A protein has these predicted regions:
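Bacterial Sec-dependent N-terminal signal peptides
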Residues: 1-14
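Hydrophobic core
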Residues: 17-27
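Sec-dependent signal peptide cleavage junction
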Residues: 25-40
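Active-site-proximal helices and loops of the catalytic beta/alpha 8
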Residues: 38-49, 56, 62-68, 72-73, ...
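Aromatic- and acidic-residue-enriched carbohydrate-binding clefts of CAZyme catalytic domains
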Residues: 43-46, 83-115, 152, 157-203
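Structural beta-strand segments of beta-rich domains
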Residues: 536-540
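Aromatic-rich carbohydrate-binding modules that target alpha-glucans
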Residues: 541-584, 595-609
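Cationic, amphipathic, low-complexity alpha-helical segments enriched
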Residues: 608-614, 619-622, 626-638
């Protein structure tokens, strides 16, 4: 288990390393018809599915058979440009040219995919890498990319980026002069001009670089891409990003503000002011990492604490500016987020996201991986290619190599719910202070979530009109219904489950489906908390708010016993102190103490003397997740 924070107090129940990090942070036509009918009454269609490391041919078919009929608004594809060779997924994030021949398919296949997705009513978002090229630790000397483009990762020569205007491509002169790895995130210049995990850092202020990169975006646009997810934007100055976008918009004759722009910026209040997420909304929307932290925190604690989430997150990013997710490919593989391995809690968190009224929701279609193999590429990947996947076959069971989240019964139902309720406000919030919550979306929809281990008899108030509604979380054929009478819902909510109702799916009038549930639905019959973890250690990461601290230590208690020696913390290359503690299977409370200055810190109070632990806190504050997680050499880190 890993805890990372720049805040100093937390309490966690030790549940093992394979749990998540606590942070201070067969498809039948009738099934498709169900989703399509829901989409026809949609007030909104903005759900995004991240089709991670899937080929263009695979995505094209899934657009036609699943995403379009379900009412998905966008599918996000992995970086389409040529990259370094390697089986690992992160090789896609080390470009060697902007040729559209990659491990995931050819330019012709890419164009065909876009046409097929568009015909199904699904727009394509491209994951775009503009910050860096290759890492010197994995791409030394003369090498070739997956499409054969030559480059030299030692000298910084990349002729594959050549254009008519710049026939020599990219040379060392087109990168920032700083050749050291980023270590101090309080220094904006270092973050934006030095190297992220040894990767050559484009001089984004350079007009030549801006021209080459804007030409790449034009090429994507002309092929039909209608959204751009900009990778590692924190490492690019806002003015430089604005200049690239403006060059791009002028070349295609569009208003820059009308181009859908998603920027990956991981916020951390302890870092430089100029790299905070709010600075980037001038150029487009921003990924809100705080949302996934809250999901991870409270679905492992008390979901009732999600009350007021919109207001909390809106202090940093307005809902219209935020893209939210329960997990993405990075966070899933680096702890700090719920994943499919968390079973029903993961499903419930995604249902909450699709039911709630904050941000634009992003789902993840991903393959499964074993612990310790987080860098592994898609099943069957070679150093230069990824095989096509027959999702109808892979998703005909729940034990294949792929995690078919996009086809789960709950996902289908909640996308329809989300589209139907549109911008209706959250009303009628109710909770029991613990594992059960419920709320309406005005008179459009209602959801109740039971995150507990026992079935719950509930009586909730709802703004839905009286009637018999399909429970779209549980079934696709309306074989399970819930009645609203007198503005009340009286029912039983199964353990680790939910009920979801919306005005467009009633017993009297509902979409047709031949099957109650999808065969890809995960098996969540085992209540996860009943399994005792074998790893009872916890690793705590901490960055002191006070720069005068030189020898921070962890002062901690196990259970009610605070007679433990203080744990020494060691400084890592990214500026975080860390300590690993054996919890002996007990809850752990901790504060931080600097031995030199004899100062103490916790997140609840400003303290210069030893503070009293706040025992009511059960996990780390969600807003204090750090910007980076230490990564093996050569991989693209969460940054």
């Amino acid at each position: 288990m890993v805890v990372q924070t720049n805040r100093p107090f937390g309490r966690v129940v030790a549940i093992g390393a394979t749990a998540a990090m606590a942070c201070a942070s067969l498809v039948a036509a009738p099934i498709m018809a169900q989703a399509q009918s829901n989409a026809q009454v949609s007030a909104k269609k903005d759900v995004q599915v991240i089709a991670f490391q899937q080929t263009w041919n695979t995505i094209a078919k899934e657009c036609t058979e699943t995403y379009g009929p379900e009412g998905v608004g966008y599918v996000e594809v992995s970086p389409p440009q040529e990259s370094i060779q390697g089986t690992q997924w992160w090789t896609s994030y080390q470009p060697v040219s902007y040729k559209l021949d990659s491990k995931l398919g050819t330019e012709a296949e890419f164009a065909s995919m876009i046409k097929q997705c568009s015909a199904a009513g699904v727009n394509v978002i491209a994951d775009v890498v503009l910050n860096q090229t290759t890492g010197s630790d994995v791409a030394k000397g003369e090498q070739a990319g997956v499409a054969g483009s030559k480059y030299n990762g030692s000298t910084g020569d990349y002729p594959g980026f050549a254009t008519k205007q710049y026939p020599d491509g990219i040379t060392a002169a087109d990168f920032h002069s700083c050749d050291k790895n980023i270590s101090n995130y309080t220094n904006q210049q270092e973050v934006q001009e030095c190297r992220l995990s040894s990767m050559w850092d484009f001089n984004s202020e350079n007009e030549k670089v801006q021209d080459i990169q804007s030409d790449y975006l034009v090429k994507l646009w002309n092929l039909g891409v209608r959204g751009f997810r900009m990778d590692a934007v924190k490492h690019i100055h806002t003015d430089s990003m604005k200049a690239i976008k403006e060059k791009f918009s002028k070349k295609i004759g569009q208003n820059a503000n009308d181009i859908y722009w998603i920027q990956e910026v991981i916020g951390n209040s302890s870092e430089a002011a100029g790299i905070q997420p709010g600075n980037y909304v001038q150029n487009g929307t921003v990924t809100e990492f705080g949302f996934k932290s809250e999901m991870n925190q409270y679905f492992k604690d008390k979901v009732a604490k999600l009350k007021g989430l919109n207001e909390r997150l809106s202090k940093d990013l307005a809902s219209k500016d935020a893209n939210v997710f329960v997990t993405n490919w990075d966070t899933a593989r680096n702890q700090g987020a719920l994943t499919y391995k968390d079973g029903a809690k993961y499903q419930l968190a995604n249902a909450f996201m699709l039911a709630y009224d904050y941000g634009t929701p992003r789902l993840l279609s991903d393959y499964k991986w074993d612990d310790g193999h987080n860098d592994d590429g898609a099943p069957g990947a070679t150093v230069a290619s990824v095989p096509d996947v027959d999702m109808n076959k892979e998703c005909s069971t729940n034990n294949s190599a792929w995690n078919c989240e996009q086809r789960w019964t709950s996902t289908r139902g909640m996308i329809a719910f989300h589209n139907y309720v549109g911008d209706a406000e959250v009303t009628d919030w109710q909770d029991d202070g613990g594992d059960n919550i419920a709320f309406s979306r005005d008179d459009h929809g209602f959801i109740a979530i039971n995150n507990g281990k026992k079935e719950k008899d509930v009586t909730y108030t709802t703004s839905l009109a009286d009637g018999e509604y399909c429970d779209v979380y549980a079934t696709m054929d309306c074989s399970k219904t819930v009645t609203v009478k007198g503005g009340k819902v009286e029912t039983k909510v199964p353990a680790r489950s939910a009920i979801a109702l919306y005005a467009g799916a009633t017993k009297a009038s509902h979409p047709a489906a031949s099957t109650a549930t999808d065969p890809s639905d995960p098996d969540v019959s085992k209540i996860d908390d009943e399994v005792t973890a074998t790893d009872k250690t916890i690793t705590i990461y901490y960055k002191p708010a006070d720069s005068t601290w030189k020898t921070p230590k962890v002062h901690y208690g196990l259970g009610d016993d605070w007679n433990q020696p203080e744990a020494d913390m060691t400084l890592d290359e990214q500026g975080y102190y860390r300590a690993t503690i054996d919890t002996k299977g007990k809850k752990i409370d901790f504060v931080f103490h600097d031995a030199d200055t004899d100062q103490w810190e916790n997140p609840e109070v400003e303290a210069t003397t030893m503070p009293t632990p706040v025992s009511s806190r059960s996990v780390w504050p969600a807003r204090s997740c750090p910007s980076a997680i230490p990564s093996p050499s050569g991989r693209r880190p969460v940054s």
